[in-house]
Amino acid sequence: MAKPTTVKIKLVSTADTGFFYVTKKNPRTMTEKMTVRKYDPRARKHVEFKEAKIK
């Protein structure tokens, strides 16, 4: 079985609520850290989410 091309990453909220999303990314095409503006239900607004490793 071949190694998967995508890796799972965790998108952690910068609002310090502890909320996170889990998503996939292709490390060959996206070499830099991912930052996305998404909705944080604990803060009840759209905030920036930054990439972190899944432990």
UniProtKB/Swiss-Prot annotation:
Lineage, highest ranks first: Bacteria, Pseudomonadati, Pseudomonadota, Alphaproteobacteria, Sphingomonadales
Intrachain S-S bonds: none
Pfam families: Ribosomal_L33
Keywords assigned: Ribonucleoprotein, Ribosomal protein
PANTHER family per UniProt: 54S RIBOSOMAL PROTEIN L39, MITOCHONDRIAL, LARGE RIBOSOMAL SUBUNIT PROTEIN BL33M
Gene Ontology CC terms: cytosolic large ribosomal subunit
Homology family: Belongs to the bacterial ribosomal protein bL33 family.
Identification of the protein by name: Large ribosomal subunit protein bL33
SUPFAM superfamilies listed in its UniProt record: Zn-binding ribosomal proteins
Organism: Sphingopyxis alaskensis (strain DSM 13593 / LMG 18877 / RB2256)
